[in-house]
Structure formats: C-alpha cells, structure tokens
Amino acid sequence: MSVHTVMRTQVRSLAGMPKAAMRPLGNSFCARRYLSAAPLRSIPAAPTRLPLNRRWEPKRHSSSATAAAVLEQAAAQPETLSQDAIIESMDPAEAARISKVRNIGIAAHIDSGKTTSTERVLFYTGRIQAIHEVRGRDSVGAKMDSMDLEREKGITIQSAATFCDWVKKENGKDEKYHINLIDTPGHIDFTIEVERALRVLDGAVLILCAVSGVQSQTITVDRQMRRYNVPRISFINKMDRMGSNPFRAIEQINQKLKMHAAAVQVPIGLEDEFKGVVDIIRMKAIYNEGPRGEMVVEKDEIPADVRPVAEERRRMLIETLADVDDDIAELFLEEKEPTVEQLKAAIRRATIARTFTPVFMGSALADKAVQPMLDGICDYLPNPAEIENLALDQKRNEASVKLVPYNSLPFVGLAFKLEESNFGQLTYIRVYQGTLRKGTNVFNARNNKRIKVPRIVRMHSNEMEEVSEIGAGEICAVFGVDCASGDTFTDGQLNYSMSSMFVPEPVISLSIKPKNSKDLANFSKAINRFQREDPTFRVHFDTESEETIISGMGELHLDIYVERMRREYRVDCETGKPQVAYRETIGKRVEFDHLLKKQTGGPGEYARVAGWMEPTGNLDGNNFEEQITGGSISEKFLFACEKGFGLACDKGPLIGHKVLGTRMVINDGATHMTDSSEMSFKNATQQAFRKAFMDSQPHILEPLMKTVITAPSEFQGDVIALLNKRNAIINDTETGVDEFTVYADCSLNGMFGFSTHLRAATQGKGEYTMEFSHYEKAPGHLQKELIAEYEKAQAARHKK
C-alpha cells in the first residue's frame, strides 16, 4: 500500500468525527528542547493556531515587572509556562529582534556539499566578497575551512561558526534576518563537532546528495538531531550530477529516517540540464543569473514539461501535511485548497514540532537555488524564543527550570566549544537568558569560580569582530575564560546549571612520544590543549609500559592530531601500532569467600568479603551491591569495597582492559578490631574479584564497527571479497544506477589499513565510513592470542 493510500485511508477514517474532536488538548506551537544528552522526548501532539503575523505584535503591557513574574513562573512552575506566554510578555523591541534571529547548523554525510553550500550562503548574504572552493583549488580554499589541513584534505575537521544577515522579501517589503551559522564535519571521526553544534542550535539544514540520498552519516546526523530535539529543513544538493534523483532521496528520508518529508520545490531539468526550481507553494519558476548566480529571477510561467510534476508534488505536499497538521487536515476533509499563507504556516508548525521536514533542491557548486533555501531557513526554522530550553536549579535539588530569552533577566550561558588562538583560549558561548557584557563578572556553575570577561567577539571562521555585549538567543566567543567544554555560566544571581552534550567513548588507541626529548614541553602543551578542545580525544599514561597513550574515534582522528602537533607545535612524534579498545566480561555466576590476612606484628591487614559475581545481562556498565545483614561489615568499609570493585573493573584480569556487564554482590564478611582498614577491604575486594572473574570462564569482547562501503558496481565482487577476508557480517546491500552500497558489521581489529586495500580494489573510487556499533565476544583463537601477548608483555616487564 502506498504512502498516499494509507494517508487517504486515515483521512477518510476521520471524516465522521466532529472538528472539535480532531483538536488535541494542550496544543503547543513551539518545539520542546531538553538540554540533556538523554534520548528524544515525545513530540508535542499538535501545534497552536495563532497566525504567524500576530505572534510578534508588540505587547504594551511588557515591563521589567512582567519579566520578573515570568522568571518566577519559569522557576516555580515551568510546565505551566508556554513559549507563547513568554513571547507575548516580551518587550516589543526585544520581540522584534529575536523574531529575526536564527541559530542553525549545516550537517550531512561527508562530501555532500556542506562547506560548498555554506560558502554560497556567505557570498549571497554579502558576508564574503568572493567564492572559493574546498581543497584550496585556487590556493585560498573555502572560508569556513580555516585550517591548512582542512584545505589540503578537502574535509572539515572542526566546526566553524559565522554570522550573516539575509534580506528576505515579505509581503512586498524587505525583512532582515540575522543568522548564526555553524558548518560541521561530515566524517564520523569528528562526530563530537556535530554533537556540540547541535547541542546549542535551534534548527539545522540537513544536506543530502541527489545521487546517493540518505547515506550512513546522514543516519548518524539524524540520530544526533533527534537527541537534541533539533528541527530541520532538508536540502538535496548536487542536482546537476549524473544520476541525480531527488524524489528517491525524499522517499529515503521517509523510509530510512522515519520522518515525514515532502518537496516544496521540483527541479527544472536534471543532471547537466538542471536550470532552476519551481516553488510549488507559490507555483513560480526560480532561476539564477549572473556570474555566480547572485541574481534570483522569478517567473510565473512554468515550463510545460515541469508543470504536471509540480502540480502532482504540490498535491503530495498537501496530503503529507494533512497527516501531521490539523488545520490542513480539516481543509483536506472539506476539499478546500489551502492558501499560500496556510501552507507556509502549516509547514512551519510541523517543522518546529519535528514531525515534518520540507525538502529544497539545488546545486551549490553550480550556484543554483541556494537563495530559496535561505528563505526556507527564515520561513520554517524557529527563532530562539520558540524553543524550550531547560536548566537545573542547584538551590532546589536540581529542579527543572525554564530559561526565558529576555535580555533584562539574569544571565545564563553554556560554553560548548573551546579553541586555542593567538590571543589565548577562545570559548564559544550560547547565551540562553540575559545579556553577556564585556568587563562583567560571570560565575562557573561547576566550580563557582568568578571570572571577568575581558573581550567578547563574534566569529567569522578564523576572523573575529569585537562587540561590547551579546543578548539572549545569540552565540559569541570570549577570551580569557578558563573553563571546560559544557560548563554553565551565570552572573551569580541564579544558581543554574545545564547538562552537557553526549560524548561517545573512544574505540582506538595508540602510543605516542616525541622523537626528540627536547620537545617534551611542547608535546605536553599540545596534548593538554587538544584534550581541552576535544572531549573524544583522551590521553593517559600507562604505568606498566611507561608510554603515553592517546585514544580517539578512529585512525583519521588520531592521525590529524599527530599531524597538528607537527605543524602547530613543531613536534615530530613516533607512534605505535594502533590498539583496539577491547573489553572483558564475566562468563557465569561464581560465588566467592575471600580472606585477606597479614598479621606480622604491628598494624596488619584483615578483611573478609563473601558473596557472588554474575553477568548483568547487558554491556552498559557494571553493578556493585551490598546485602549485608547484622553489620558484619561497617558502612565505611563497604564504601572501600565498592571502590575496590571499580578499580578492578578498570583493568580486567584477562588482558588489562576494562570490564563490562559484571555484577558483584557482597552479602557477608568479617572485620578485625585493630587490623581492618579501608585499604584492607579495598584490596580484599580486588583480589576476590580477580579470582572469581577468572573462575567464571570469562570472555574478551571486541568492538564491532558499523561499516558502510560505496563503490562503482563493477567492483562489487572485489569489495565483498575484502569483507569476507575480514570475517565481516554483511547486513544489507543496495544497488544504484552505477554504484552499490554494502552495510556490514566489521571487527575493528581487522579494519586497520582497510582504506589502502579498498583503494587498490576499486581503483581509488571506493569510499567507506565506520562508527562503533556494539561489543561482541571475540573468536576463541583471537582470545587465546590476546591473552598470550598480554602474559608475555607482563613477564617481560617483571624481568626489568
């Protein structure tokens, strides 16, 4: 059954219902943003019906007293304070300002054209005077790729922030919108850059390739957008490429991303015949003219061969909206044609409610149809006042409070990105409430340290513009603020904190040291800086091997940092063989009764612990429980037991890797009046853990990577052979016009150097992405090899 048939069936089933019954209670026009790394909350049932042109009318009753009352309600009863009420009580001048602000990110699969699209946005908004392409073909490179490495490799490594103004025609007059924009990397190794950008943004543009459609990293980005409840519009890029099929991409958005999507444009021509688009809401043809497509020409005349497609897609747009918006559903039932204003209002409501994404089309590289996408950002993505942001009140046992984007209220902001510059540490801050002013003091909610703000700047890639203050809903950067990524700042009047972004665990490690010992100081500086900037870049010193170990999201991730150390700090490094982040887990339930007794005169050690260890049933973590009755072990010694359990889990008995999926229960024990201590019980627990663990037939777990490979169809057999050689589990294959895609779960251990083999097998035309999927029991032969290697290394160290 087709999507349209299902939709019509649903609408017919509503035909007998009274209109009032179709309107859910508790409508909410605005998206609900929970500032946490928790999974997606439920989507609001339906939007309100307040017309757009009335939402921002000046309210004469606004005053500082009103703002204070709103703040009080936001703290005491956040669930009763709607975003509409916040907007209606806003100062008229402030309402006018914030209604024209958009905080957006551009995200996509690698090589979908994010940076190229951003370059056109900056050019058409007048932010830059000339367009430069990625890879630095003209020895300049794209504006947002400010690092030499980015321009050389043609990839984005760090998210880059900028701002621009877009003048849009509304009802015959020009309206200026202020856009804060963040361009993000597409490579999975730099996923933290996407996480922290989406954490503080109100909306996003999801870019898809017209040929490839939804790809592996598109699915990852979609998951990240859902994690932070970010509404999005979609832009199908590369419409001029051979094999482009935008409607297949829209179908994939519906099916693979499980998101209602419909075109708001149709192309005029495809591939090398692509000339422009038809706006199917207003039924106008749109073309770009001028050397770089800077002139937008609208025509009422739609090409005869395109009109039937435009009319059919307009009908499909209305049907899709009827499925997610009550107003359009009512018009559909009454067989009335919605007006342009009604359609745009419905698209905006459904987009902000995250039940729908409007799909635009164009070619950034060919300078076609980028400006209509800019109009879509203004029309359909929310302003900061339309997104609900929550914080935690530390004075009220971390009760949830709503942040109110009024400039007059006490300041609350979140540091979401750190960067080293020539002038010191640069801290990017999103202002959620109040105003951040130069020269004022702010307080770090994590450590309650007071910090003076010496300089505030607005960033334009690697350039900056000094400002004296930044209002609610804006993004800026400050100098001289010592903090960590994810810290909350206030002006001291409120004791609020905001939860940080989701940080994935590293999957690959390698040893590193400077080739020349005189470079140790710079080596340490670089390591410390990179750790502050990137939460997924981890460093620790292995006391047994006496090596510095760096960990990250993939080979490319660590290679980039090694190269940055050479370029930015002039430190050449030697690196060891990449190490896989294996894990260990218990095999079966085992009981233990362990006594630690050392009494040789003077203070001794005495601790007895008894209980059992067993699998938890999942690999999310480990559990420690005490079921002591009769006080055989005192409370303070039980804390020591729990600490010993944690230390034992940090370094497993099999090969020294972390333990997962293990529960330890202590239900009995004994103490000595003088010889028992916290140290004794900590050591006894660790010893009991090791013995019980080894008796349980334990397993080594290896990380399996979700791997997606795309290559020309003629190389399919060679690629499958490469995967079979690595014992990969092939989950699915898709065959396109001239290329194929393989989805597989691969052992990370078998994927080192895979890019070289793939290039050789596909004449350099194949590409692949990997991201962590899950842990699986390692094959028996691999477990034996790893244990033998570990024991050999341990024996060698003990000989020294």
UniProtKB/Swiss-Prot annotation:
Pathway: Protein biosynthesis; polypeptide chain elongation
Domain tr-type G: 99-385
Organism of this sequence: Coccidioides immitis (strain RS)
Family annotation (Pfam families): EFG_C (PF00679), EFG_III (PF14492), EFG_IV (PF03764), GTP_EFTU (PF00009), GTP_EFTU_D2 (PF03144)
Physiological role: Mitochondrial GTPase that catalyzes the GTP-dependent ribosomal translocation step during translation elongation. During this step, the ribosome changes from the pre-translocational (PRE) to the post-translocational (POST) state as the newly formed A-site-bound peptidyl-tRNA and P-site-bound deacylated tRNA move to the P and E sites, respectively. Catalyzes the coordinated movement of the two tRNA molecules, the mRNA and conformational changes in the ribosome.
Compartments it resides in: Mitochondrion
Transit peptide location on this chain: 1-34
Highest taxon listed in the record's lineage: Eukaryota
GO molecular function: GTP binding; GTPase activity; translation elongation factor activity
Protein name, UniProt field: Elongation factor G, mitochondrial
Chief location category: mitochondrion
